[in-house]
């Protein structure tokens, strides 16, 4: 397994590497493009990089700040490419992990009602919506107005026959949800290889927080709560030990 990570990562990179090692395979990687010819003076192209990587392993997991980069890599690579997250594009392996968690906990995916809370521009949300279009699952999206589904995304989801609606406040939708998936509304710039902003980056408005009180008074007792992590203040730490949390 080759892991080519042009952006910071904790879970996707380590999870793929751990999985390969547990299966008896081997791993070689780079996790900082600045330490390669793709990130220094030469700015080596994706085409040339993946053609070279193809000689070193059997499959590549790529995370990149450019939307569509893994797709571009797949045009030139002689071995399979797994998308580990591409800019604001998609994050399919994260959603496959979430679907596995739901299947393990609930025994099914079809028929479950989903609630997605957070920034709908995020790659995780895109992959969630596309993934749910393959199942009989209604979903409600809750996000700040400037982070809502784009008209283009809505048209895509309509074409895929996804049963979806939007709500302004999490309290309007949480009571019916079997699965609650949360992402931050305070985001880094995913089009950069590294976002190193310092100081106060703001907090999460109450409309988009999942608190212990909200869960205990509004949510189903057997609902499950997911988060791709890292989190900020959208899920307080005291939720971790409740019956709903499934992000650990």
Per-range role (PLM):
Residues 80-85, 139, 245-248:
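Short hydrophobic/aromatic-enriched beta-strand-loop microsegments
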Residues 1-103, 232-233, 237:
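Phosphate/diphosphate ligand-binding glycine-rich loop within oxidoreductases
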Residues 158-240, 247:
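Rossmann-like adenosine-cofactor binding region
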Residues 6-24, 104-183, 188:
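Glycine-rich phosphate/diphosphate-binding loop of Rossmann-like nucleotide-binding domains
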């Amino acid at each position: 397994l080759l892991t080519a990570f042009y952006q910071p990562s904790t879970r996707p990179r380590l999870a793929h590497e751990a999985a390969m090692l547990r299966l008896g395979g081997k791993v070689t990687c780079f996790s900082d493009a600045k330490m390669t010819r793709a990130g220094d003076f030469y700015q080596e192209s994706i085409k040339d990089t993946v053609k070279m990587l193809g000689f070193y392993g059997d499959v590549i997991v790529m995370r990149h700040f450019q939307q569509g980069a893994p797709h571009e890599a797949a045009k030139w690579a002689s071995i399979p490419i797994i998308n580990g997250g591409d800019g604001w594009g998609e994050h399919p392996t994260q959603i496959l992990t979430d679907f596995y968690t739901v299947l393990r906990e609930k025994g099914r995916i079809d028929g479950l009602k989903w609630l997605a809370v957070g920034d709908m521009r995020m790659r995780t949300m895109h992959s969630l919506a596309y993934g749910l279009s393959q199942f009989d699952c209604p979903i409600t999206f809750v996000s700040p107005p400037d982070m809502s589904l784009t008209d283009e995304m809505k048209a895509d989801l309509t074409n895929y026959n996804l049963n979806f609606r939007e709500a302004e406040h999490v309290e309007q939708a949480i009571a019916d949800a079997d699965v609650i998936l949360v992402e931050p509304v305070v985001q880094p710039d995913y089009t950069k290889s590294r976002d190193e902003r310092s100081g106060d980056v703001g907090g999460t408005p109450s409309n988009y927080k999942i608190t212990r009180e909200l869960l205990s008074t509004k949510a189903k007792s057997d609902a499950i709560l997911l988060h791709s992590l890292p989190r900020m203040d959208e899920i307080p730490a005291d939720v971790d030990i409740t019956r709903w949390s499934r992000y650990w």
